[in-house]
Regions:
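Short "lid" loop at the C-terminus of a central beta-strand within the Rossmann-like core
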Residues: 7, 141-143, 170-172
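Auxiliary Fe-S-binding modules of radical SAM enzymes
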Residues: 155-159, 169-310
Length: 310
């Protein structure tokens, strides 16, 4: 998408990672195993676009074999979902979140910088529901871009009987031309929804550290989430660690640099070594960028969203 991997920066001349620099499935599994004793309960596979990774279902199966109680999720643009959803389900995937910012084909193509039509994503969503996966829609809202899609996205979530989560446009990385003026706050989005669909009632989080603030639309018994890292940050309750495709551990979405686990693994570190290291890193983290945004000096080179997922 234009706010994640804009073509002017990630074009045919961009130097992507060489194969040897990419973390292998076996190395991912070692990291997951090392985090289980630390309280890991959920693994989300993101991107980039995870369904472009060769044999991604094998990774899901390997993670599932570690612990049958792990919650395994995936975030995808949905374009390839329809043809892979049955194998994903059989491999052990529990839930899928589909990114969808517009139901208007022209605007969808503009925001995703693609030639695909919305219908293909909707087919993927329906296929995932039919396969028995738990499904959510994620929608990033930008001012003067897709505010007019908010109520259409709510209507779609009603039609499919699945939650939709609205995300404030975030200042992740340096390539997405972020400006505070482009942010439509969660409150503004709720006001738009309530004018069309009636009152929303705030509900309790489903678990500690849930990033989306949950609201209930009584008229349709529908859950709507709002991820408000700009207007209402949640650093103090964040429980998410991120592993990049080159094996770095990031303790914050807005980090300038990560901790290189891959090099340590390739120096023969074992599961225990990693567990001790990750525990130490996590317990010493001081990331509060979203809460301190106004006071923080400019980060010289924050990590791009496409490196570590959402």
């Amino acid at each position: 998408c234009t706010y994640c991997m804009p073509k002017e920066h990630f074009d045919s001349n961009y130097k992507f990672l060489a194969k040897g620099q990419i973390i292998s499935y076996e190395e991912i599994i070692l990291i997951v195993k090392s985090m289980l004793p630390l309280g890991l309960s959920k693994v989300r596979i993101t991107g980039g676009e995870p369904l472009l990774r060769k044999d991604i279902c094998s990774l899901i199966s390997m993670i599932r074999d570690l612990d049958e109680n792990l919650d395994i999720a995936m975030t995808t643009n949905g374009v390839l979902l329809k043809n892979k959803v049955q194998t994903l389900k059989e491999s052990g995937l529990d839930r899928v979140t589909v990114s969808l910012d517009s139901l208007d084909d022209d605007l969808f193509k503009e925001m995703t910088d693609s030639k695909f039509e919305v219908s293909r994503v909707l087919e993927g969503i329906k296929s995932a529901i039919d396969a028995g996966l738990k499904v959510k829609i994620n929608s990033v809202i930008k001012r003067n871009k897709n505010e007019n899609q908010i109520n259409n996205l709510v209507k779609t979530s009603i039609e499919y009987n699945i939650p939709v989560r609205f995300i404030e446009f975030m200042d992740v990385g340096t390539t997405n031309s972020w400006k505070l003026d482009s942010v439509v706050t969660g409150k503004e989005i709720r006001d738009i929804i309530q004018r069309e669909f009636g009152p929303l009632t705030k509900t309790k989080p489903n678990y500690y550290g849930e990033v989306a603030k949950q609201w209930k639309m009584a008229r349709h018994d529908l859950d709507i989430g709002f991820i408000e890292s700009i207007s209402s940050p949640f650093c103090g309750s964040c429980t998410r660690a991120r592993i990049s495709s080159n094996g770095k551990l990031f303790t914050c979405l807005f980090s300038e640099q990560g901790y290189d686990l891959l090099s340590i693994i390739r120096m023969q570190a074992d599961e225990h070594d990693l567990s001790v290291l990750i525990s130490d890193i996590w317990n010493k983290r001081i990331d509060r960028y979203s809460e301190d945004r106004k006071e923080v000096k400019v980060i010289s080179k924050p990590v791009e969203m496409s490196y570590i997922g959402g």
